[in-house]
């Protein structure tokens, strides 16, 4: 029983070190909320993300975090959040922002936190990250695409619906968002579910399964 528990634990927390230890895709599920902040000139000045991990992953990581860091839970989660963000940095925080087909890199988040959130009597871990944009693309009149995904598809990310994407903007802007689901073939789905722990070359699979958020903003009185 102890061997099984350790195997499950390694599978669930392996993404923290970015070395996927086990197969069958996906292993964990993340529900996201994304907020885009535009200034009076219609420039994107900040992106705020919230990732809610599934109940099973959350329960195991809460226990493992306290055990590893040997600290009370709030302090242990601070240490774990720092490690998560550091490990996500080389992968651009699994985030892809395209404005008029040009990719904009996210800077390191100026604030982040890993906290326990309660919903319907259950506890979930939520990672929040706040990015102040160093490059400020203009949203007004632009074609904007936003995706968050694990390239290997070990973790499935989803906003679930467009209402989990919000856009804070000045009154002179009018913005809308649309959730676009991927077009998947039966062959691709079968391949993803056939993978086992020996598979390592799965880069690109996450992109194929990734949803896209399409954002359109217009200045009031302007028509494209």
Task: Name what the model sees in each region.
Residues 6-19:
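Bacterial N-terminal signal peptides
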Residues 100-224:
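Mature, soluble, non-transmembrane domains
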Residues 56-137:
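Structured domain cores in non-transmembrane regions
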Residues 29, 88-90, 208:
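Short solvent-exposed loop/turn micro-motifs enriched in small/polar/acidic residues
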Residues 26-59:
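Early extracytoplasmic/domain-onset interaction patches
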Residues 1-4:
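N-terminal secretory signal peptides that target proteins for export/translocation
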């Amino acid at each position: 029983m102890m061997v099984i528990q350790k195997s499950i634990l390694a599978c669930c927390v392996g993404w923290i070190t970015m070395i996927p230890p086990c197969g069958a895709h996906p292993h964990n599920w993340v529900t996201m909320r994304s907020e885009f902040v535009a200034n009076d000139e219609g420039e994107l000045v900040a992106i705020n993300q919230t990732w809610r991990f599934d109940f099973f992953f959350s329960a195991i990581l809460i226990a493992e975090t306290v055990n590893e860091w040997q600290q009370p839970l709030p302090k242990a989660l601070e240490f774990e959040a720092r490690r998560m963000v550091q490990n996500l940095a080389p992968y651009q925080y699994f985030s892809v922002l395209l404005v008029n087909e040009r990719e904009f890199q996210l800077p390191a988040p100026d604030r982040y936190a890993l906290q326990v959130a309660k919903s319907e009597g259950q506890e979930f871990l939520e990672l929040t990250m706040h990015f102040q944009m160093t490059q400020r693309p203009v949203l007004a009149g632009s074609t904007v695409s936003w995706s968050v995904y694990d390239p290997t598809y070990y973790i499935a990310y989803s906003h679930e619906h467009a209402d989990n994407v919000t856009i804070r903007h000045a009154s002179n802007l009018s913005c809308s968002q649309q959730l676009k689901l991927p077009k998947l073939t039966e062959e691709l789905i079968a391949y993803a579910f056939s993978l086992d722990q020996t598979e390592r070359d799965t880069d690109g699979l996450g992109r194929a399964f990734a949803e896209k958020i399409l954002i359109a903003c217009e200045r009031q009185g302007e028509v494209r």
